[in-house]
Amino acid sequence: MTVLITGGTGFIGSHTAVSLVQSGYDAVILDNLCNSSAAVLPRLRQITGRNIPFYQGDIRDCQILRQIFSEHEIESVIHFAGLKAVGESVAEPTKYYGNNVYGSLVLAEEMARAGVLKIVFSSSATVYGDAEKVPYTEDMRPGDTANPYGASKAMVERMLTDIQKADPRWSVILLRYFNPIGAHESGLIGEQPNGVPNNLLPYICQVASGRLPQLSVFGGDYPTPDGTGMRDYIHVMDLAEGHIAAMKAKGGVAGVHLFNLGSGRAYSVLEIIRAFEAASGLHIPYRIQPRRAGDLACSYADPSHTKQQTGWETKRGLQQMMEDSWRWVSRNPGRYGD
């Protein structure tokens, strides 16, 4: 079975490519490299022993999609491609709706044209909006998303759901991620965003590597045990394996299938800092800053439905997330290819 991975050279996409190949699938990658590097490709070959076909292009380009579908017998698509910086989405909403929503529409149209009616969509827990009831369960209605990034994910979920209702042959799997961190245990691939990081751990890693003098912790007065915000963190390889489990369980079943991918436990910012210090042997200086508007005190998944339906659950704990992250950062102080 051959699977097209859009955004396959990115953080989650590259780890999912590894998991796919190691699970016996053939993979094809499409990526425009706007937030990743083609230098990941030889590293994927080193890990998997396979040359994964790669196309540099945009999901909004119907011609390159038609080329891929004509040159490969694609049976399913795992769709990661999209922009994901919350702050940038507020400043440039049209960019996000154009890439994330319109791009997904073009992809769905070309899939239908090619007779490929199985898609796994990389959604996000941001679609739950500012819901304060935790844990988050799949039967909770999407909330008022706080930014265009989250809104774009909710729109694509709705669009794919409507497409499946109109053509019941489709299998649509919607995966709502929580906070992926960690790296492949080899230290060959990991998170290396272009520009400003969007997540906590890359900032911690920049402090550890000396690129930042200290970490800013936004909010020290939340109603949590240590006053800092708490989030559900998941190892990126557990997340990658969740895609395979969902595809195996529901990829051949028509309908819309919605799953949370999280650990079911929340860790505070200070817990993450302490765990990273233990893994690296380094001190991470930090300063408590005022809360950011829209940030919640605590959010985490209820992954029980996912386990019941697919058999998937997380296997890697917080310490392994930190150890793998530190191995990645310490072995790759520059950028891919530097």
From Swiss-Prot:
<feature type="binding site">
    <location>
        <position position="178"/>
    </location>
    <ligand>
        <name>NAD(+)</name>
    </ligand>
</feature>
<dbReference type="GO" id="GO:0005829">
    <property type="term" value="C:cytosol"/>
</dbReference>
<feature type="binding site">
    <location>
        <begin position="216"/>
        <end position="218"/>
    </location>
    <ligand>
        <name>substrate</name>
    </ligand>
</feature>
<feature type="binding site">
    <location>
        <begin position="80"/>
        <end position="84"/>
    </location>
    <ligand>
        <name>NAD(+)</name>
    </ligand>
</feature>
<feature type="binding site">
    <location>
        <position position="149"/>
    </location>
    <ligand>
        <name>NAD(+)</name>
    </ligand>
</feature>
<keyword id="KW-0413">Isomerase</keyword>
<feature type="binding site">
    <location>
        <begin position="31"/>
        <end position="36"/>
    </location>
    <ligand>
        <name>NAD(+)</name>
    </ligand>
</feature>
<feature type="binding site">
    <location>
        <position position="99"/>
    </location>
    <ligand>
        <name>NAD(+)</name>
    </ligand>
</feature>
<feature type="binding site">
    <location>
        <position position="179"/>
    </location>
    <ligand>
        <name>substrate</name>
    </ligand>
</feature>
<dbReference type="GO" id="GO:0003978">
    <property type="term" value="F:UDP-glucose 4-epimerase activity"/>
</dbReference>
<feature type="binding site">
    <location>
        <begin position="292"/>
        <end position="295"/>
    </location>
    <ligand>
        <name>substrate</name>
    </ligand>
</feature>
<feature type="binding site">
    <location>
        <position position="153"/>
    </location>
    <ligand>
        <name>NAD(+)</name>
    </ligand>
</feature>
<dbReference type="Pfam" id="PF01370">
    <property type="entry name" value="Epimerase"/>
</dbReference>
<feature type="active site" description="Proton acceptor">
    <location>
        <position position="149"/>
    </location>
</feature>
<keyword id="KW-0520">NAD</keyword>
<feature type="binding site">
    <location>
        <position position="231"/>
    </location>
    <ligand>
        <name>substrate</name>
    </ligand>
</feature>
<feature type="binding site">
    <location>
        <begin position="58"/>
        <end position="59"/>
    </location>
    <ligand>
        <name>NAD(+)</name>
    </ligand>
</feature>
<feature type="binding site">
    <location>
        <begin position="11"/>
        <end position="12"/>
    </location>
    <ligand>
        <name>NAD(+)</name>
    </ligand>
</feature>
<comment type="similarity">
    <text>Belongs to the NAD(P)-dependent epimerase/dehydratase family.</text>
</comment>
<dbReference type="GO" id="GO:0006012">
    <property type="term" value="P:galactose metabolic process"/>
</dbReference>
<keyword id="KW-0299">Galactose metabolism</keyword>
<dbReference type="InterPro" id="IPR005886">
    <property type="entry name" value="UDP_G4E"/>
</dbReference>
<feature type="binding site">
    <location>
        <position position="149"/>
    </location>
    <ligand>
        <name>substrate</name>
    </ligand>
</feature>
<dbReference type="InterPro" id="IPR036291">
    <property type="entry name" value="NAD(P)-bd_dom_sf"/>
</dbReference>
<comment type="pathway">
    <text>Carbohydrate metabolism; galactose metabolism.</text>
</comment>
<feature type="binding site">
    <location>
        <position position="124"/>
    </location>
    <ligand>
        <name>substrate</name>
    </ligand>
</feature>
<keyword id="KW-0119">Carbohydrate metabolism</keyword>
<feature type="binding site">
    <location>
        <position position="124"/>
    </location>
    <ligand>
        <name>NAD(+)</name>
    </ligand>
</feature>
<comment type="function">
    <text>Involved in the metabolism of galactose. Plays an essential role in the incorporation of galactose into meningococcal lipopolysaccharide surface molecules, which are important for pathogenesis. Catalyzes the conversion of UDP-galactose (UDP-Gal) to UDP-glucose (UDP-Glc) through a mechanism involving the transient reduction of NAD.</text>
</comment>
<comment type="subunit">
    <text>Homodimer.</text>
</comment>
<dbReference type="InterPro" id="IPR001509">
    <property type="entry name" value="Epimerase_deHydtase"/>
</dbReference>
<protein>
    <recommendedName>
        <fullName>UDP-glucose 4-epimerase</fullName>
        <ecNumber>5.1.3.2</ecNumber>
    </recommendedName>
</protein>
<feature type="binding site">
    <location>
        <begin position="199"/>
        <end position="200"/>
    </location>
    <ligand>
        <name>substrate</name>
    </ligand>
</feature>
